[in-house]
């Protein structure tokens, strides 16, 4: 069985826990949600680690999720198709290493 990881769609300027619904990539319809560190969050869904098939359905799912996030948040940084993290903890560590408060 393949190890589960987190498929990353985008980064937003928000600390709010947010669930976007069962929209995840790969036909699995996993919940799309935020993983946060201070006032930054990555929008992710669970997915087996590894490659995601490059096909119309997956590309459109990736794009539609980013568009849905953009309807609610002003500061959205899309992430390249096919980007994974091993876990929510890895995402928090990555955000923490890159975090720079506005007051700095």
Where are these regions (language model features)?
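An interfacial alpha-helical scaffold signature
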Residues: 1-100, 104
């Amino acid at each position: 069985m393949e190890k589960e990881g987190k498929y990353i769609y985008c980064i937003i300027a928000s600390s709010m826990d947010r669930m976007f619904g069962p929209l995840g990539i790969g036909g699995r319809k996993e919940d799309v949600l935020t993983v946060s560190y201070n006032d930054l969050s990555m929008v992710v869904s669970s997915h087996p680690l590894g490659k995601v098939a490059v096909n119309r359905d997956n590309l459109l799912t990736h794009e539609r999720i980013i568009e849905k996030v953009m309807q609610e948040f002003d500061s959205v940084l899309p992430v390249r198709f096919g980007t994974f993290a091993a876990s929510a903890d890895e995402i928090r560590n990555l955000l923490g290493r890159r975090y720079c408060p506005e007051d700095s």
